[in-house]
Amino acid sequence: MAVKAKAKKAAVKKAPARRKKKGLTKRDVLKKCKQLSNWGKWGKNDQLGVLNYITQEDIVEASKLIKRGKVFRLGLNLDENGPQNGLFGGRWNPMHHMMATGTDAVQGIQEPLVGMRYADDFINLPTQCASQWDALAHVFVGDQMWNGYPAKLVDARGAHKNGIEHFADKMVGRGVLLDVARYKKKARLADGYAITATDLDRTAKMQGVEIRRGDFVIINTGQMADCLDKGDWGGYGGGDAPGLSFHTVDWIYEKQISGICSDTWGIEVRPNETVDGTNQPWHWVTIPCIGIVHGEIWYLRELVEDCAKDGVYEFFLCAPPLVITRGTGSPINPQAIK
């Protein structure tokens, strides 16, 4: 009786295991939030965050940086020609409306009513549509905001904790421009370029300036100037942009600066460095956990040119917000004085 030979099983070559894509994830972001949290550092009732680093003595010293009396405006005009395009949160550019005009006056309409001739107007705008400060109520991590306050304390009436009004007499001190674009020998950094802590340190070294506790650090990427030169904002409002890498959060925490500002829409690099779709991860750490205020959409052209000319990259900065009760941000016109 013939014995049938057992068929040999064909060797099946296993496909190599797929490697998980490496990169920044929400889990990494939340871990960094916990690691760099300043909650409770200035007491359980604090609503100022790292603005607490600025002392009265610091302000006096900063005032001594005024040598020439030269003032640089760092705010954009509030008008219909701003950078908003509705891509993020439906923000629009300022709308200016007249309530009383010279046309009314010369037609004799006003005097019978109020006994004088005059003009009056109002503006309709999102608080963060142009050059602005973010309040510490602007960004949440989970269900909490700065210092552990519940996010639900920001309701239809505004921010009952961490509102912008708490900054009313705080936004003055030493300003430092870090012209990263110039350090990289570029008029404008490319969209998607992630500025590293090494870039920041080397820019400061090139400029001969030291970053100190309580400083307001202003980053120039050249993006805004490029848009203004072209007469086209393009995707500036929420699109791709050069900006700070997520990993600069450690630099910000360790330097103990009090404000971080930029000529871009959102300071951090876009597209973001996360691989799982976590949006604006740098914001998650900096505002609600470290407690640092953001100055966004700052106009830097003349200041950048002057600093390059005289080699002085430090100045007195005065940038108070509008005292908007329970506001989550405020339009501003910062002043750098040298």
Enumerate the predicted regions with their spans.
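Active-/binding-site microenvironments in catalytic and ligand-binding cores
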Residues: A2-K338
